[in-house]
Regions:
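Aromatic "clamp/platform" in nucleotide-sugar-dependent glycosyltransferases that forms part
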Residues: 81-82
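Short glycine/serine-rich donor-binding loops of glycosyltransferases
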Residues: 87-90
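A short hydrophobic beta-strand element within the catalytic core of glycosyltransferases
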Residues: 77-78
Length: 177
């Protein structure tokens, strides 16, 4: 038996042209609009942080290029997901130096660096979010205001994801041997 990742070696190359775009104080919700993704939490955040731009990607009809341009301009990709199998959108974001802000649950527990995970209970429900709203907004402010300091960690996150979760290298080696 060979433990391998999901073969996505092509993704880094396909996003290269979006990597060095000027960053804006933009936070994205790149998930589908579904109850388990908790878009209501994300939609409430602009009331606390009016100086930042928040975009729910599925609220627009975006081409792949338009979506990737948003990723390239954004400083944060936000998740409050209650269901996640692999999480490709946060990997796409990290590939273009966008900070992934993810709960410490689901696949994120194993895949995410501690610096990008927040306590699971902060977004366990909308009610829980209301109790932890200040902590979440402070984390977002820190990521936005200190963005450049996080770039080395984003790249470390990309290396971990690329090598351990989004590579078919072990599978290919197993087939060849």
């Amino acid at each position: 038996m060979v433990r391998t990742g999901w073969p996505m070696e092509y993704l880094a190359r396909s996003l290269d042209s979006y990597k060095n775009m000027p960053k804006e104080n933009l936070i994205l919700f790149p998930h589908r609009i579904a109850p388990e993704k908790q878009p209501d939490i994300f939609r409430d955040l602009p009331t606390q942080l009016p100086d930042y731009e928040f975009i729910v990607c599925q609220d627009q009809v975006l081409t792949k290029n338009e979506y990737h341009n948003l990723l390239g301009r954004a400083k944060i990709v936000f998740s409050a997901n209650l269901q996640e199998t692999l999480g490709i959108s946060w990997y796409e974001g990290a590939l273009v130096d966008t900070i992934p802000m993810v709960p410490d649950r689901l696949s994120y527990q194993e895949m995410g660096l501690e610096e990008f995970k927040y306590p699971s209970e902060w977004t366990a429900s909308f009610k829980a979010y209301t109790h932890h709203k200040e902590a979440i907004t402070e984390r977002i402010k820190d990521y936005i205001e200190n963005y450049d300091n996080y770039i080395p960690l984003i790249r470390k996150q990309v290396t971990k994801l690329k090598n351990d979760f989004f590579s078919g290298k072990k599978l290919y080696e197993g087939i060849i041997s």
